[in-house]
A protein has these predicted regions:
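Beta1/beta-strand and adjacent pyrophosphate-binding region of the FAD-binding site
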Residues: 159
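…; additionally, a secondary subgroup of soluble metalloenzymes is captured
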Residues: 1-156, 165-315, 319-327
Length: 327
């Protein structure tokens, strides 16, 4: 039954028949229903592919707007979902043992995302951002510490996940929201331009002055920020009771070790690198969407663990920059 149903749904999408219904249910409703049923679970990837292909077809045509403020608003309210549909389409497409039956749908989906959405969006954003002198009206990443960290009344753990773009952050936000013990909020911030790791990481530290040296090193108030120890020195110059840690170092620590490190600290920066580590290399860039899913899982698990083991309840999750990616 599921194989026949999947073939029918795929045919409807290949014909771009978004109004197709079965027993009064739309394509996304059918996919969600079948995934929950016993025999449909073994076809979860196929149903997720179909559901997200539908999302790209239904919402993928980019609507030009006037001005960067409206472009930002439209992305937050609608366009980020297109990026998310694209991410999940390939996340599950890559899990298929045999993708031959879905190649035609993949080509159609890719064409819509690339030509009807991404290309038009980039032209519009570049034009609007240039006209606005590089100002979006969003809070600036340059003001992150003074705006978000310095004013905190309790110990704050800042988790900086390299290349955690907005729509992936929304996925994490929704996961946190679903936890009845958690109160989460989500907001956007304008990254520094150009949006490279070295600039974004420096901007997230407390500073009065950020400079790019002739050798392309970035300094904060005259101090280097290339590695963990250098960033910790910058942070401790402003907040003595603070630490900078790597996610990979603390994920395997015992409870006693965590408590020893976190006791007495007011601010702890945790650097997490799952997405950029794989997406920024040609040999692993096709794994970037799997890395996004793993990043959400890892950050969620870290928050749960530190809440119990390190007596911490206030977290800020942010990124140095985002990313654009297409197959």
């Amino acid at each position: 039954v599921d194989r026949r149903l999947i073939a029918w749904l795929r045919g409807r999408l290949e014909s771009e028949d978004l109004d197709a219904r079965l027993d009064g249910k739309s394509i996304p409703e059918i996919c969600a229903l079948r995934r929950r049923l016993h025999f449909g679970r073994q076809f979860r990837s196929e149903y997720f592919i179909l559901e997200n292909a539908f999302g790209i077809m239904a919402h993928g045509s980019y609507t030009p707007v006037s001005g960067i403020a409206d472009a930002v608003r439209q992305y937050i309210e609608r366009d980020e979902a297109v990026d998310r549909h694209y991410r999940y389409f390939y996340l599950y497409f890559d899990r298929l043992e045999n993708s031959a039956d879905f190649e035609r749908l993949r080509d159609l989906t890719e064409n819509i995302y690339t030509n009807d959405h991404l290309n038009k969006q980039l032209v519009g954003w570049n034009r609007s951002l240039t006209e606005a002198g590089g100002k979006t009206g969003l809070p600036r990443q340059l003001d992150f510490y003074s705006r978000c960290v310095r004013t905190a009344r309790e110990r704050t753990v800042v988790i900086i996940s390299d290349a955690l773009r907005y729509e992936v952050g929304r996925t994490l936000f929704e996961r946190l929201q679903a936890d009845e013990k958690c109160t989460a909020t989500l907001s956007a911030m304008q990254a520094v331009l150009p949006s490279y790791t070295r600039f974004g990481m420096a901007a997230l530290l407390p500073h009065k002055r950020i400079e790019l040296c002739p050798d392309l090193r970035v300094t904060v108030d005259g101090k280097p920020t290339d590695d963990l120890k250098q960033r910790e020195a910058v942070l401790q110059a402003v907040q003595p009771n603070s630490r900078c840690l790597r996610f990979d170092d603390i994920r395997s620590m015992k409870v006693a070790e965590l408590r020893e490190i976190f006791t007495g600290q007011d601010v702890v920066y945790v650097y997490h690198n799952q997405i950029d580590a794989r997406g920024d290399k040609a040999s692993t860039e096709n794994e970037v969407f799997a890395a996004c899913e793993e990043a959400v899982d890892e950050i969620f698990a870290l928050i749960k663990r530190l809440t119990v083991s390190a007596n911490t309840i206030h977290y800020i999750i942010t990124a140095d920059h985002g990313f654009l990616y297409k197959r």
